[in-house]
């Protein structure tokens, strides 16, 4: 799944950084994302500090395949509408597994998840071996980064210390991914 601008060895390096508790910036369908191991509270704290994000907002998890999301989801079968929309730019709120930490759910009973169609983001999840956190690479409330250069600009000097930046293209025509509640059908973000 590597692209011309994202060599396989860089994907492996960034996956190793995630496994070691680090934070990585990487391209997604619409913007650059910040990611970390969702099961590592120190890594999530670093990401939230870098982004200056309120932990009560919760975080999105992305994966390269549905099975990578299973540890974070409740036991109910996934609705057909969810499965039919993946891989793709569709994030769904689904019932969280009882052990899913509050730093991922924002203290709610649901978790936001997506199976990404972006080749670099999917390759990163594969190399990491599971789902990763995905939140836009910018300070909370600021415009999202759409290039590696913008990641450095938006996050400032801390970006060099806290985040490895994985090169690769984003779809410049794409809007941020839609977020919908799978149970109610409510559109959270169009």
Curated annotation (Swiss-Prot):
This is Threonylcarbamoyl-AMP synthase. GO terms for biological process: regulation of translational fidelity; tRNA threonylcarbamoyladenosine modification. It comes from Alkalilimnicola ehrlichii (strain ATCC BAA-1101 / DSM 17681 / MLHE-1). The lineage of its organism: Bacteria, Pseudomonadati, Pseudomonadota, Gammaproteobacteria, Chromatiales. It is an enzyme of class 2 (transferase). Keywords: ATP-binding, Cytoplasm, Nucleotide-binding, Nucleotidyltransferase, Transferase, tRNA processing. Residues 8-190 form the YrdC-like domain. Required for the formation of a threonylcarbamoyl group on adenosine at position 37 (t(6)A37) in tRNAs that read codons beginning with adenine. Catalyzes the conversion of L-threonine, HCO(3)(-)/CO(2) and ATP to give threonylcarbamoyl-AMP (TC-AMP) as the acyladenylate intermediate, with the release of diphosphate. Its EC number is 2.7.7.87. One of its GO terms (cellular component) is cytoplasm. Belongs to the SUA5 family. TsaC subfamily. HAMAP family: TsaC. PROSITE patterns: YRDC. GO terms for molecular function: ATP binding; double-stranded RNA binding; L-threonylcarbamoyladenylate synthase; tRNA binding. InterPro entries: DHBP_synth_RibB-like_a/b_dom, Sua5-like_dom, TC-AMP_synthase, TC-AMP_synthase_SUA5. PANTHER family: SUA5, THREONYLCARBAMOYL-AMP SYNTHASE. It catalyses: L-threonine + hydrogencarbonate + ATP = L-threonylcarbamoyladenylate + diphosphate + H2O. The gene is tsaC. It is found in: Cytoplasm.
């Amino acid at each position: 799944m590597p692209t011309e601008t994202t060599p396989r060895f860089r994907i492996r390096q960034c996956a190793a950084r995630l496994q070691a508790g680090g934070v990585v910036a990487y391209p997604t369908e619409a913007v650059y994302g910040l990611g970390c191991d969702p099961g590592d509270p120190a890594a999530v704290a670093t990401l939230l500090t870098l982004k200056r994000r309120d932990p009560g907002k919760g975080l999105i998890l992305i994966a390269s395949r549905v099975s990578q999301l299973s540890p974070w989801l409740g036991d109910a079968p996934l609705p057909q509408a969810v499965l039919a929309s993946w891989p793709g730019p569709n994030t769904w709120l689904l019932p969280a597994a009882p052990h899913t930490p509050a730093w991922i759910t924002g203290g709610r009973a649901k978790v936001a998840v997506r199976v990404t169609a972006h080749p670099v983001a999917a390759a990163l999840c594969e190399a990491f071996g599971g789902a990763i956190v995905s939140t836009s690479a910018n300070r909370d409330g600021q415009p999202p980064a759409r290039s590696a250069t913008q990641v450095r600009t938006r996050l400032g000097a801390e970006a060099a210390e806290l985040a490895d930046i994985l090169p690769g293209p984003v779809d410049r025509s794409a809007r941020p991914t839609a977020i919908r509640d799978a149970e109610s059908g409510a559109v959270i973000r169009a």
